[in-house]
Each structure stands twice: as structure tokens, then as C-alpha cells.
Amino acid sequence: MLDENKMKRINELAQKKKATGLTDQEGKEQTLLRKEYLQSFRQSFKKTIENTTVIDPEGNDVTPDKVKEIQKLNNIRK
């Protein structure tokens, strides 16, 4: 994930946008920070999904086939 300073800056810019609006430079900064945040979030979420195994109440592995294939490619699953 993003470091704490970047997260604070994203929130500062969001609050300023609501209160008084942003300059062009601040708007560009906000866009870049949001893109960086989304990229980091998606990467983290993808890793979480790739390392997840789904087990039903009977104890059967019901992990989606697409996830199983990715796990095999990454040597997570045999």
C-alpha cells in the first residue's frame, strides 16, 4: 500500500476540493496520487485472491478454476 504521507495528502486534497476547490496543479497531483493508490490497492487485492482457497461447509475445495490455475502458475497449488 501507499505510505502514510501519500494517504494523508490524498485526504487533504479531497477535503480541500470540497471546501474551496483545487488549483490545476493540485488537481493533477490528486489524479496521480489516486492512480497510484488504485494500482497499489488492486495489486494487493489480486495477491490476496491468488492466495485464497475456498472451502464449502462439507470441506470440499470450491476455489474457482481460474484462481486455481493462477495458483498453479505461481507454485502455490500443486
From Swiss-Prot:
Main location: cytoplasm
Pfam families: DUF896
One GO term describing the cellular component: cytoplasm
Compartment(s): Cytoplasm
InterPro entries: DUF896
UniProt entry keywords in alphabetical sequence: Cytoplasm
Keyword Cytoplasm: yes
Similarity comment text for this entry: Belongs to the UPF0291 family.
HAMAP family reported for this sequence: UPF0291
Protein name: UPF0291 protein MCCL_0996
Lineage: Bacteria, Bacillati, Bacillota, Bacilli, Bacillales
